[in-house]
């Protein structure tokens, strides 16, 4: 079964997309075509959206699912006339919350992501810059400022995990790729030894690693199964020897990997 899902907002669309994606992920037997439509902030744009929604309904033979965080009532009324199934995220959750808190919400465009109202904005930017500056072992002299240092073989998911933790939680995460020399010595690189308490390992199934590396450097020693198998085996051996916690990233999303790391290491999120 295939359905179309729209994430519509008169702002960035981040809230609609994030919550909508989380809900759709619970329906693994359905394939969704996901379309994000930010800044639908005029009646003309809304009418254009209705045409897109109706076209998708006709194409799929089923109503598209619409997750919206549109504040403007006129625009919402126009969207409601489409052949889609609308889930108004703000009204769904704000009404019962207003009742519980005995207070009216400041229901305005971009409220959850505006720079002027977000005291953590600079924290997030600094964390992202830290992740980029300390990616792939490029710099090690700032490790004293890191909240976490991810270690593992090349292409095991260290960089996207560091960037996700920076964006989502404001965590300053560096990453360091273990080399064959490190594996053969079966001991931590000198640059990492002072920061043992900050280390967390990422490993991955050899088959998956070979497939990922093949996309980057096909038919090379780097992407061969035997090389990947060797690196994964020796890396896990090193991590166990040094008593560094690690997880296999193969079957987890970056969100799940990040959450597991923070729980295991007891690192507090800077953005709450």
Curated annotation (Swiss-Prot):
Enzyme nomenclature, EC number: 2.7.11.33, 2.7.4.28
Domain of life the protein comes from: Bacteria
EC class (word): transferase
The entry's keywords: Kinase, Nucleotide-binding, Serine/threonine-protein kinase, Transferase
Pfam families, alphabetized: Kinase-PPPase (PF03618)
InterPro entries on file: Kinase-pyrophosphorylase (IPR005177), PSRP (IPR026530)
Catalyzed chemical reaction(s): [pyruvate, water dikinase] + ADP = [pyruvate, water dikinase]-phosphate + AMP + H(+); [pyruvate, water dikinase]-phosphate + phosphate + H(+) = [pyruvate, water dikinase] + diphosphate
A single GO molecular function term of this UniProt record: ATP binding
Residues that hold ADP according to the record: 152-159
Disulfide bonds: none
The keyword Transferase belongs to this UniProt entry's keyword annotation: yes
Protein task: Bifunctional serine/threonine kinase and phosphorylase involved in the regulation of the phosphoenolpyruvate synthase (PEPS) by catalyzing its phosphorylation/dephosphorylation.
Record family assignment: Belongs to the pyruvate, phosphate/water dikinase regulatory protein family. PSRP subfamily.
PANTHER family registered for this protein in UniProt: PYRUVATE, PHOSPHATE DIKINASE REGULATORY PROTEIN 1, CHLOROPLASTIC (PTHR31756:SF3)
Protein name as catalogued: Putative phosphoenolpyruvate synthase regulatory protein
Organism name: Azotobacter vinelandii (strain DJ / ATCC BAA-1303)
């Amino acid at each position: 079964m295939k359905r179309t899902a729209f994430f519509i907002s008169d702002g960035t669309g981040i809230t609609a997309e994030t919550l909508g994606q989380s809900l759709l992920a619970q329906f693994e037997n359905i394939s969704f075509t996901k379309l994000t439509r930010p800044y639908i902030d005029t009646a003309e744009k809304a009418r254009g959206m209705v045409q897109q929604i109706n076209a998708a309904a006709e194409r799929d033979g089923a109503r598209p699912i619409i997750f919206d965080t549109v504040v403007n009532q006129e625009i919402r009324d126009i969207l409601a006339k489409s052949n889609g199934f609308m889930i108004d995220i703000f009204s769904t959750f704000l009404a019962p919350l207003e009742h519980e808190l005995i207070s009216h919400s400041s229901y305005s465009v971009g409220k959850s992501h505006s720079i002027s109202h977000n005291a953590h904005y600079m924290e997030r930017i600094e964390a992202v810059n830290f992740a980029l500056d300390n990616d792939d072992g490029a710099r090690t002299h700032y490790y004293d400022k890191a909240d976490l240092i991810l270690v593992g073989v090349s292409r095991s998911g260290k960089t996207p995990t560091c960037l996700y933790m920076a964006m989502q939680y404001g965590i300053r995460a560096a990453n360091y790729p273990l080399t064959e020399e490190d594996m053969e010595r079966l001991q931590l690189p000198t640059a990492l030894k002072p920061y043992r308490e900050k280390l967390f390992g990422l490993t991955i199934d050899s088959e998956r690693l070979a497939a990922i590396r093949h996309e980057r450097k096909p038919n090379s020693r780097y992407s061969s199964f035997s090389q990947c198998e060797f690196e994964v085996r020796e890396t896990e051996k090193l991590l166990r020897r040094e008593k560094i916690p690690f997880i296999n990233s193969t079957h987890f999303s970056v969100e799940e990997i990040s959450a597991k790391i923070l729980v295991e290491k007891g690192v507090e999120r800077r953005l709450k």
